[in-house]
Amino acid sequence: MTMSQSQTKKGRIIGIDLGTTNSCVAVMEGGAPKVIASAEGTRTTPSVVAYKGNERLVGIPAKRQAVTNPENTITSSKRFIGRKYQEVLSEIKTVPYKVTNNNNGDAVFEIQGKIVTPEEIAAQILIKMKETAEAYLGEKITEAVITVPAYFNDSQRQSTKDAGRIAGLDVKRIIPEPTAAALAYGLDKENADKKIAVFDLGGGTFDISVLEIGDGVFEVLSTSGDTHLGGDDFDNAILNWMLETFKQEQGIDLRNDKMALQRLRDAAEKAKIELSGVQQTEINQPFITMDASGPKHLTMTLTRSKLESLTHDLIERTREPCLKALKDSGLNKDDISEVILVGGMSRMPAVQEVVKSIFGKEGHKGVNPDEVVAVGAAIQGGVLTGVVKDVLLLDVTPLTLGIETLGGVMTPLVERNTTIPTQKKQIFSTAADNQPAVTIRVLQGERKMANDNKEIGRFDLADIPPSPRGTPQIEVAFDIDADGILHVSAKDLSSGKEQKIRIEAQSGLQEEEIKRMVRDAEEHAEEDKKRKEEVEIRNEADSLAFRAQKALDEYKDKVPQQIADDISNKIEAVKKALETTDIARIRSAKDELERQMQQIGEVMSKAAGQSETQSTGPGSYQESSNQSSQHQTNNNKPDDIEEAEVEILDDKKP
């Protein structure tokens, strides 16, 4: 290993695609990005967290039990992160678990009588991704690049960073998903300036970004999207069709049956995926419910054309953001040389047709839409550590940022699609004589009036010296960092009085709450580790007892009675220990049995030695000698099994 390779091993930064439906983790290895498979052997992990009593399940185990535990299984939590309860009323209607609001009006989950925030759910998924990387790399991971939808606002980005902190990760950079995909696509492209569009339709959000790439520079020209549009909405369209059809045929409304709804939601997702490759699919859900006449079964045929009619409006909703992104970039469709398809929904033929109609060309299918974002995040991690050189990423802010001014008007300071990091300053004044303070209300959005945009923060600049209206010179500065997170300051130029804030997420997570959640996550990680160790000890003890009993039954005629009785007692001790929750007792009983089992091995070795001595009498010597001679002259015979055994044993000798 060279010095440079050794250095790249230190401070490795993983790339995480924290998706609505699935998440993925990748890392730079040997100068190339590598997607890491989970413990279950899959390259993506369902973004699902479930609670069963004191147990927390993440990923595939959580998804598997969702049908029987829908109220305590959180899916699509990304649609709620950094958002107020009033902003997610439409999403709440589509999930089986309880979404409520806390004291700040934030959307939170109520699980088993406790309040759990979307940030905590996201943190559990990030911990799973972190552990997946650690298991593969064999080293502790503390740093990550995490992707977010390009159209995520400031609150949602900050909440994602908070989730990373709760998971024990230092989030070195938040980057938009389309930008990450462009990095993955363009890293090995040697072509000079090339303009591309990244069409990213995932499980919960839609993004479109237009970029110019060339000579290692990835410059985002514009971005647009819809954070309320994704695969979940397509699933719900199929689900509603199934519910209506079943109600018409059977006269039974399944909407209040949460277990049936979860089964149908899973069936809808499966049918949607299948119809990307076939023209029709069967949906069969036996014993979905029952009435006085007996059990009812749901059997339906869904064709691709029917799916397209059910989801036509959803697919068409991708058109306007694409046209807006093109317009904002100053390009037309003929200037775009490639349209990169990202996100699972981009596999749908009807979606690909819309892409073709908008851009006048087929979408590029040379990247894996489920993995490309994580790959791009890993590349960005490589850029930050110096593993990837000569790459410059120039991103933009997706929404206009400004403040409220006289008359309830929003005055922009940073226009949308401004390259970041950036700083903008503007001078304002007071609206009344002798005004002692001003309230700076920070807004994000494209509307003209302040109340029509999203308020992402507010603060006061006090102790302004008395003076006529319009006289004080108040400088407001907006500073956006590379993560797209905003820092705001206001300064009275006459007195030098200044007030600064970093715009915190409107998730209501204060510093103390984040620290508490970090501690909670660490404690749960320790609990999970102990629980895993307990399961392993139990399995080992149970397996040993079984093997010991089998060996005892097999060799009971050759084992002295005293040893046989001792082993029987030890087996019984293990079985009794397994009936308890005392792990120390189980471990002790297992160790005792292991020691006792060695005696069987010793007895059998002696018996084998005596048997071999007896078998080498005058009558058998010639045969043995012949075999030995035969071995020497036929080294390479494939059926010479005895010789193979001897060679293996010899190889193991020091």
Curated annotation (Swiss-Prot):
Residues 592-654 are annotated as: Disordered. The modification Phosphothreonine is found at T205. The keyword Zinc-finger does not apply. Induction: By stress conditions e.g. heat shock. One of its GO terms (molecular function) is ATP-dependent protein folding chaperone. Residues 622-636 have a biased composition (Low complexity). Gene3D superfamilies: 1.20.1270.10, 3.30.420.40, Actin, Chain A, domain 4, Substrate Binding Domain Of DNAk, Chain A, domain 1. The keyword Lyase does not apply. Keywords: ATP-binding, Chaperone, Nucleotide-binding, Phosphoprotein, Stress response. Residues 608-621 have a biased composition (Polar residues). Belongs to the heat shock protein 70 family. Acts as a chaperone. This is Chaperone protein DnaK. It comes from Protochlamydia amoebophila (strain UWE25).
